[in-house]
Amino acid sequence: MAEYWSACENIQNVFVVPSRDLSMFVRLRALRRLAGQAELANIDVALSFDPIPMIDYFAFLHWLQADATIGLSVTQYSLFRISIPDPVLEVPRRHAGERIVRTLAALGIATGLDQLKGLVPRSSEVAMQRRGEQWARPRIFLNGFGASTTRTFSATQLAAVARELIAQDSTFQLTINANAEQRTSPELRQLCADQPSRVQLFRPDATICDLLDAIAGCIVVLTPDTGVAHGAVAARTPLVVVFDDVEYNPICWRPLDRHAVCLLPERPEPISCMPVDKILEGIRQFLVR
């Protein structure tokens, strides 16, 4: 790989896609948002890192090159699959981005950790600029579940968080993305019956495009899923992400953004065990007008 890289004399811009748990659409949408930034106006090579082999990065890069709406010039595309040992086994809470940067440096590839911070450089500053328009109709997005049972809030937690937020400010509107079990639970059914004008359930047939669009208009997002968390950073929306810090949701893949609060339980346990007060404490950091 190092020999191939040194032979590419015309390569000037490298875009690193930290793609763990991210859908193709989220990566594509983030690239669209980068189009106006001069230093990334031309991307020569996109590097992708992901331990999940089923994702077709060649298809993604072809799609990137073919989509004229992105506004980026991709003069060359290559896929480097670098074998990176699971950082959870090395140092449990060291961010995976650090390992990626060290691996690149060992290959003679210059990059920086700032390129790994949630896909969008300076997203924090942009998020602050957008807060005025978001507060005109303040909506909070509660994503109730992830890809495994340990990464799922209980219906009781969701309902309790929602009721506390509704009581805090009469202008707050809540959207809850619930799985089938949560959606039919007595707690959420009663919540929606009690607050029909202020709480809505996100439709179950929604796509990742719909999800990202909904997140982009919110003042804060709560999620136990790292894919949704990185999507929120790409959408430049403040977020609270809850980790169980076990095999399927290691904190080493957390978003790197100063408008992302990461919560951990006191011990490795399902997210459904996290106290509601701790969740609310994280959310309320972003509820200051």
Which residues does each PLM region occupy?
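Catalytic machinery of carbohydrate-active enzymes
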Residues: 1-289
